[in-house]
Design a protein with these regions (language model features):
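RNA pseudouridine synthases
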Residues: 1-161
């Protein structure tokens, strides 16, 4: 999978390494894959990680599926999913009371199974809600966005009501 974006005009000066580590919060393991495979391109060319990115630069990140093997999940029922929001990276659904977020046993069916069937590919639990709790729950639609979302959620404080 490839991701491309353009450095905006209002972007602060930083290196490729700082861009991936501090701005996009890409974890060390994923940065390692990107660096060793030379899968970070700036304006179509590989670049030294200490090189600065410039306003208007085209950044391309290439992720190999082999680095992120998909888990096999039993199929769920997509009609049980109430979608609240979805984009290319995440899906947010309403978890009903009485349904587990994820299974404890390999053959058990839970919300994760239903969401994965709804999306058409394996999704990943970003956070969970207790079985008896209903509410919005976030799933990552690919394995390389999951640790980024986890790092963002770690920085957020919240209060149980």
């Amino acid at each position: 999978m490839n991701y491309q974006f353009t450095i905006p005009q209002s972007f602060p000066q930083m290196t490729v390494k700082e861009l991936l580590e501090d701005y996009f919060l890409i974890p060390r393991k994923i940065r390692h894959f990107l660096r060793t495979k030379k899968h970070v391109l700036v304006n179509g060319e590989t670049i030294n990680w200490q090189s600065p990115v410039q306003k208007g630069d085209q950044i391309q990140l290439i992720f190999d599926a082999d680095d992120y093997p998909e888990k096999e999940l039993p199929s769920g029922d997509p009609s049980l999913v109430e979608e609240l929001y979805q984009d290319e990276h995440v899906i947010i659904v309403n978890k009903p009371e009485g349904m587990k977020t994820h299974a404890n046993e390999p053959t058990e069916i839970a919300l994760l199974n239903h969401v994965s069937s709804y999306v058409g590919s394996t999704c990943y639990v970003v956070h969970r809600l207790d079985k008896e709790t209903s509410g919005a729950i976030l799933f990552a639609k690919n394995p390389f966005i999951l640790p980024i979302l986890n790092r963002i959620l770690e920085a957020v404080s919240y209060t149980h009501l």
